Amino acid sequence: SSLEERRAARAARRRKQDENEGGEEQEETTSRRSRRRQQEDEEDSYSAPAEPAYDAEAENRRRQQQEEEEAAARAAEEEYNRQQEELRRQRQEEERQRREEEQRRQQEEEERLRLEREEQEREEEARRMAEEQKKKKKKGLGGLSPEKKKMLKKLIMQKAAEDLANEAKAKAEAKEKYINDLVPKFSTDGKDVAALQALCKDFHKRLASLEEDVYDWEAKIRKQDFEINELTLKVNDTKGKFVKPVLRKVNKTESKLDKIQRKEAKKSDFRDNLKSSREHEADKEGGEGENE
């Protein structure tokens, strides 16, 4: 306790004083020292009952300090939790804004594509009308009346639409067959955890292999595009002029309709040639009869 510490300190001071004092004054100082010791012991005996009060006050201060520290720790923890909650709300708000921005960009892209499709359809319609006007100006085109031409064009369009639908269906079936071949049928009924883990690992390996294939094909396509651009630049250099490549969407329906129209044109040319050859033979026979 503090009382014992004070007594030990006084004893140490007394020993030090005893060592420093001289031999002649030893008796006189001994008597003075004894009286001083008795006085200090009496003071210690009087001050000893006040020690518990001092200890209780120190304990109260220590407890109060501890409570203040705990309150400060709780306040710091609440502040930290509040900051974390604020950060979480801020991240949620940023995520919501990001989703709204992505949705807005997607809607704008869809609107742009829709407008492009409508513009392309209008251009195709204008080009088709121009071609029809040109064909109307020509005489004897296949020997067909305007009604028959319109019916033939309608049939061609129907056939083209059927071909496109069949092609899309065939592509979808081929895609589904390819996916079914890559991912065989499986069942999880009656399997334990080890079997399910092995199944998941097998699917993960398949997925990694397919990702590698996708990466390889994308690299090949990029390489081919680069080679095509390089060859285009070389061709333009040999021509002595540079033509900026125009990237536009290719309408498969238009190309197929052009192909069908070319076939029909060939058939009509064959009929015209056949008709003209018959007329030529008839004229020739008529000329021989007159000569006879």
UniProtKB/Swiss-Prot annotation:
Keywords on record: Acetylation, Actin-binding, Muscle protein
Region (Actin-binding): 237-250
Composition skew (Low complexity), residue ranges: 46-55
Pfam families from the UniProt entry: Troponin
Biased composition (Basic and acidic residues): 58-134
Start and end residues of each stretch annotated as Disordered: 1-149, 255-292
Top-rank taxon, per record: Eukaryota
GO MF annotations in UniProt: actin binding
GO biological processes: muscle contraction
Residue positions, PTM N-acetylserine: 1
GO CC terms: troponin complex
Gene3D superfamilies: 1.20.5.350
Keyword Acetylation: yes
Role noted for this protein: Troponin I is the inhibitory subunit of troponin, the thin filament regulatory complex which confers calcium-sensitivity to striated muscle actomyosin ATPase activity.
Name of the molecule in the record: Troponin I
Species: Chlamys nipponensis akazara (Akazara scallop)
